[in-house]
Structure formats: C-alpha cells, structure tokens
Amino acid sequence: SFVSRGLGDVYKRQPTSLVKLENLSNHLGGAQIWAKIVSEANGGAHKIYNATVHALICKAMGKKYIVGDTGAGYAGKMLSMAAKKFGLRCKIFMGIKDIRRQKPNCDAIRKNGAEIVPVYTGSQTLVDAVSECMRYWVSNCDTTHMCVGSTVGPNIFVKICGWSTAQISRELKTQLKNEFKKIPKKLKLINCVGGGSSAYG
C-alpha cells in the first residue's frame, strides 16, 4: 500500500476525509448522506494514486523516463508531481485545444519540470493525446514507461489504473467500519464518470 511505502501522510495525505453532509441529509430526510473528499489528495484529485503507482513501476524497471496523457490536465499534473518526487523525466501529451482551455494545470505541469507535448491531430483533445502518447511509448519502450491516466488502452493499464484508484474504496471500507461498526447493508454509492478512473476505483 501507499502507507507501507512511507508515502501516505507526506505525499498523499491519506486517507481523505469522509464527512456527513448534515444539512443535505436533513433537507432530504431519511437517508444519511456522506461525501468522500478525494480532492484532499495531494494535487487536488484522485489521479495522484495512479500516477504514483506508475512512477514506482517505472523506478522498479530501472527506467528514467515516463510519459502520460491528459485532457483536463489533472492526470498530467499528478504524473508530473510523481515524476518530480521520484526523479524521473516526464513528457505529458495533451491536445492543443485542451492546452488552451487548461492553462492553470499546464502551468503546474511545467512548474514540476515536465514537458507538455501538444497534439494537433484529430480532435486535438484527450482521445488523440492518448493515441500519440502510446505511439511515442511503443517507439521508446526500452527506456520509457507509460502511465495511462484513465481506464483506456491495453488491459494491463486499465487494471493498474483500477487497482491504484481503488485506494478510494479501500479507505472508504475502513472509514465506514469505523463509523458504523460494519459496512451498512443499505448502502448506495454515487460517482461521476468521465474517463472512468474514479468510478473503477
């Protein structure tokens, strides 16, 4: 786990909080409504979990370069943070349209020492950034590891993303047991879906 590697409190600020939304619960009546504040994770998003696992894999393989894709910029920002933490050289592939829309995250990526590679092909958004990133990785896989930011691409990358992001669920199970003594039988989980990484987790 992240904690056993000594990365928990310092690097991930885990576990992220589980808080009861008292006013909303009272307003709707009946059900208790809780929220897991994953935005407390270092960098402001759950993407740090996947980025950290891939950085550790890259180090374990003896590779010095890591590449990744990003759309809104969070996956790229987190990977640039993880790369900086573990002394890796980093390239982030990003559609030119997304670069124009996501200046704050692009600034953060560059501040962490990573290079943003603009993608001008196709829709000039995430789907093409993923494709260009994979093309680059296939041509440089002897020296470079690839981190896929969402549950897309070859099966192993989907599994790594799902396993690492399941840190959300691992924390949640412990927090529910601490709060209710057991996991409630009538429990409904609601999560947004974009690329699928947090939903998988």
Predicted regions and their residues:
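Gly-rich Lys/Arg/Thr-decorated short loops/hinges at beta-loop-alpha junctions or inter-strand turns
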Residues: 4, 29-40, 58, 111, ...
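General beta-strand structural signal in soluble alpha/beta enzymes
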Residues: 14, 33-37, 67-68, 117-119, ...
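Buried hydrophobic positions in well-ordered alpha/beta secondary-structure cores of metabolic enzymes
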Residues: 17, 35, 47, 54, ...
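A short, small-residue-rich loop immediately preceding and capping a beta-strand
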Residues: 42, 58-82, 86-95, 185-198
